[in-house]
Amino acid sequence: MQISQRLTAAALLILGLSTPALSQPIVPPPADVVSLSGPRVGFTVLSQSIVDTLKKDNQITVAPLISQFGWQFEKQFYSTQTGPTAVTECVLLLGGLDQGVAIPSLSWLVGVRTREGAEFGVGPNITPTGVALALAAGITFRAGTMNVPVNFAVVPSKSGTRVSVLTGFSLRRR
């Protein structure tokens, strides 16, 4: 009887001492970060009020359709292999090169991408016509380690609205 009481007391003591360790949450592994930076090319349609503002305030004369060339710096953060992932990207563009002008644009977008490649993002945009909020959506097609994004963006501002379509490529690397 004494042995069973001692075993019971020892078991209760061990269980009591280990309870704090057992109640600790399981820490998930750190998120994988993948760089998906690469060149971008496309076009932007400018509202007439944007064209007028560029001419009046910046002495830049362009047609309402301008080319876009640039680079997208992108990081994708994996949270799970089966669910959506968080994405942050910085897009630097020069517009109007086809018309002999260089109109800079900088956007920083924060968004989400599904496992199938659909993506949505929002963030600030800065151009010579002012600061605005960019809304973007698109899809990324994958071929091995190469990604080919096709994105559509709308930037409404006090000066007017800009609508862009961009594509490019990136290679998946950690």
Q: Where are each of the predicted segments found?
A:
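Cleavable N-terminal export/targeting peptides
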Residues: 1-31, 174
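Short glycine/proline- and aromatic-enriched beta-strand/turn motifs that initiate or cap beta-hairpins
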Residues: 23-70, 170-172
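Short loop/turn motifs that connect adjacent beta-strands in outer-membrane beta-barrel proteins
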Residues: 24-35, 78-86, 117, 142-148, ...
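Residues that define the transmembrane beta-barrel architecture of outer-membrane proteins
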Residues: 63-69, 102-106, 127-133, 146, ...
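Membrane-embedded beta-strands of outer-membrane beta-barrel proteins
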Residues: 71-73, 108-110, 135-137, 165-167
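Residue-level signature of outer-membrane beta-barrel architecture
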Residues: 75-77, 112, 139-141, 154-156, ...
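Transmembrane beta-strand segments that form the barrel wall of outer-membrane beta-barrel proteins
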Residues: 86-96, 117-128, 146-156
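Outer-membrane beta-barrel "beta-signal"
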Residues: 159-174
